[in-house]
């Protein structure tokens, strides 16, 4: 299948960032070397973010480049954050709570990703002998029922020495970005086939410099402290593109600590963050995920098919739990409980298409009083914006965006999605699934092309799909897509979605044991 212009731009962006970092300059350090501050390899830490989010607008794709006022607001936020952290009192209370024995360190800086991918592994590992789990967060509250002893904060490993180290790293980063901004030899590297991308790409890089000098300097200093003072046996990251996790895995790898990347979301040719994979192993959903990562130049021998921990919690909903769910959202007896996994429009270049699809879903649902549509907002979504599209339809209710959508999928009769990772959860559970994909929407191609779900392309087709749900509860949708669903699951999911947690734990234990045997 021919790649879209958007995907080709993402791949070109990744190629450029890699080439810029490695380009030789006679008698001068390369960009990768310029941004190396002892063991802190900042170009490598920032590269995935740069290629995925910052450079595509300079190539004419991705989210629009920030206006001057937008950049100034970002600079003000960065400066406010720097002032706040400069005044932050030193706190090393979690150092004393670090467990004795070998520790598996889970990098849980994005709460909903940590909840879906890391917490199932942390909980299961905590019940075993051997590796002790520690999940490192950024002041996230401990989930109800979780073992508080396993939750640490980067800011409770914030010693006076760590603060001084962060300041040194920040000064080194400021100097490196200043050289890039003011030296014509380095600026000339920021080009595509001889065409200069300065100032467009240059402004994006320098904008990233604010983040690097403050936020990433602090995370790098804490990572250096954790690696040198506590030395975990293995590190686990759920987000290969997040510069915060990359700071930890980069410093861990430099110290000989094995690192594991656990796949979070669906990935295809657009997932160019995997071009910057630098861990020892990648734990992926299924055989097709392995093929995708290999296509992004991840060595095949470093990819392990484990299945996803997020799927283990999908199974086993009881009749009482399902009735409690229906009662909570006041679903009338006889109505179908249809859950919509909504998506944020913030910083999305296809936001107008997204809003049109949401509006079509709400209009179709409102016209079917025997359905109750339960809208589960994305954790980063502007709920007021989405709620306004639903008007005052009595059979549309909104849930708390902070809750776990997997619980909703397990309890519902049918699922409506816009292409997020939760789409696979619904397919795994065999739920009738509708995924609108209007012309111009680029974020659900994996599921759209699978044939495993219903894909209405217009407002009228969305209405027709909801009509099918109302008529037979989704039986016809499931029957029409059954064969494609079975094929899709065999390619993308290990053992029907079960056992991912145990296989990830086995991978961690093996990596830690192998590292120990080398010392």
Where are these regions (language model features)?
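Conserved N-terminal ligand/cofactor-binding loop architecture of enzyme catalytic domains
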Residues: 1-116, 120-224, 229
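A donor-sugar binding/catalytic signature common to diverse glycosyltransferases
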Residues: 262-263, 270-273, 280, 284, ...
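Catalytic donor nucleotide-activated moiety binding site of glycosyltransferases and closely related
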Residues: 197-207, 239-242, 247, 254, ...
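C-terminal amphipathic helix plus adjacent low-complexity
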Residues: 2-34, 343-345, 464-519
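Active-site-proximal region of nucleotide-activated glycan assembly enzymes
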Residues: 4-7, 33-44, 53-76, 211-214, ...
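A nucleotide-sugar donor-handling region in carbohydrate enzymes
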Residues: 72-88, 157-168, 172-174, 181, ...
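Conserved catalytic-core segment of nucleotide-activated headgroup transferases in glycan assembly
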Residues: 118, 123, 311-388
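Catalytic binding pocket for nucleotide-activated donors in carbohydrate/polymer assembly enzymes
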Residues: 279, 292, 297-307, 390-392, ...
